[in-house]
Amino acid sequence: MNLNFRKKIKILTDFRSNLKMFNLDKNKIQEIKKKFKNIEFEFVDLNKMKKKYNADIYWGTRINDDIFKRCINLKWIHFGSVGIDKLDYDNVDLKKILVSNSKSINSDAVFNLILYFLIDTSRKILKGKNLNNRITYEKIYKKCKDLSDQKICVLGYGNISKKLQRFSDLYKLDIKFLSQRKNKKIDVINEREFLNNIKNYDTIINLLKFNSKNNNFLNKKIFDKMKKNINLILVGRLKTIDLSSLSFFLKKNKNAMCYMDGILEEPKLNKIKNYKNIFITPHIGGYFKNYWIKQISIFEVNLKLFLSKKKLKNLVN
């Protein structure tokens, strides 16, 4: 495939990082340019807060309202992740600007992390951390429940939840899904049913995407209804959690356990990241070895469609 177009297409990207996982290096760029001759790349300079950019396409994970306002003639934003909530869409004319994401490419990676956390709820090895004394560990273990004896609720139903459902079917787990979707093949509950039954759940897995309705969905009112020894697996968007209320809940209820995949530099996590009943991974849920192979593949497919003025895949608007 070698595509030539009359107009030069400018692609603005923020994929410049010390982490190889999120670094679009020269070799990757050259491979893309071999296939699409009339394109050029420019990296966002996050240190120049007033710089304006004239670009047709934005490709990355860090575009926010400030960067968006400094982009001139933008026609398409492609997120290199599933989450698209860094933009306030009240300020984006979705009739003029296409928005797509990279859903499904890292679903397996996130599922693997959740599975790691979920299995630990029945052993609490992460809570014991470096314990090498079985008598001391037994104090922790006696408060655990085997997965087969737990009542589990998953907040949200998408690609990752479908994988959890298949795992649940295989191991005969008691698992319900909070979702507005009606599906006879899964045990779906609505928000009212969830609120009425919170006290019955041993483990709650948060996979909620962020929107105005889900802002601080997990708040003091909900935490107060939970079991005092609840297991919380929080890999959804941080904005769906009232972190102050979470901090208060974990401090008060030492037998509760929280597993979180979040940005450790997040100021609101300062209070809780050293608690003994929380285990935080540094926002690596989406990490997997073939990220760039899949990311470039979906971007190139959409770039070809964009240049041909055809409908893009994974559109969110």
Task: List PLM regions with ranges.
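Glycine-rich NAD(P)-binding loop of Rossmann-like domains
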Residues: 128-163
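C-terminal helix-to-coil terminal segments
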Residues: 2-4, 100-113, 127, 265-317
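Rossmann-fold dehydrogenase core element
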Residues: 93-105, 228-231, 247-262, 274-286
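Rossmann-like adenosine-cofactor binding region
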Residues: 181-271
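N-terminal glycine-/charge-rich "phosphate-binding" loop or analogous flexible N-terminal tail
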Residues: 1-55
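Redox-cofactor binding/interface segments in oxidoreductases and associated redox assembly factors
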Residues: 59-60, 79, 205-206, 234, ...
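Short acidic low-complexity segments
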Residues: 42-52, 65-68, 186-201
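Phosphate/diphosphate ligand-binding glycine-rich loop within oxidoreductases
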Residues: 56-131
